[in-house]
Amino acid sequence: GAALQQLADAGLDDFYRGDVAREIAADLERIGAPVTRTDLERYHARLVAPLMLKLPGLSVANLPPPTQGLASLLILGIFERLGEARLDSFEHHHGLIEATKRAFAIRDRYITDPAELDHPPADFLSDAALMREAAAIDRKRAAKLPLRNGDGDTIWMGAIDGNGLAVSYIQSIYWEYGSGCVLPATGIHWQNRGVSFSLDRNAANPLLPGRKPFHTLTPALAR
C-alpha cells in the first residue's frame, strides 16, 4: 500500500527515478539480482507508429516488436487470404489454426529487440508475403507445430466507451509465480519476461546488456 500511495503522490515516474526506485534497487541488490538503479533510471517508454493491416471493411493496428503484435496481424492476414468464410466449418477452424502456425514460425524466427531487427516488420504484412504464406498451407492436412506446446493462462481485457476512449489490459507475470521474486520494502512481485532471452548469442533474442526481451503483448485496435 505504501508504494502505491507514494506513486499516487509523487507520480508514476517515481517507480524508475524516485524513492520507489531507490527501494526497488536496494532490494534487488540484496537478493543478488543484476538490475540496478541505473538500469531503472535509463528506462523510457517509446512512442511508436503501429503496424497496420487492411482487411475488407476495416483496418487493424497492433504494436511492432518486441511485442508479438506482428503475429496477431499475420494470423488475420493469412487467414483472410484463405477465403474460408463459413463460420465453424472444418475449413474455417483448420485455416485459422494453420495460419496461426505460420505466423508463430515467423514470430519465433524474426521478432527481437527493435534495434536489432533484420527485416522491417511491415514487409511481412505485404499482400505478396501474406499470399505466399497462405499458399503454403495444406487445406486438408495439419502441419507440425513450429514450437513446443506449453501451458497458457494469461488474461486480456478490452473496454471502449461512448467517446471512443479504449483500454487494452493484459495481466501476466509469465510463469505461475513470475520470477518468484517479491521485494520486501515495496511488496512488488516481479514477472519473468526475461525468460524469452537465450544464452545462445546467435539466437534471435540473446541475453545481452540493454536488450529488450520478446513480449507477448498484442493490444489490437480495429477501425
What are these regions (language model features)?
Residues 47, 151-154, 215-217:
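Short, small/polar residue-rich loop motifs at catalytic or cofactor-binding pockets
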Residues 1-61, 65:
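Long, well-ordered, tryptophan-enriched scaffold segments
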Residues 10-15, 30, 61-69, 85-93, ...:
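Hydrophobic alpha-helical scaffolding
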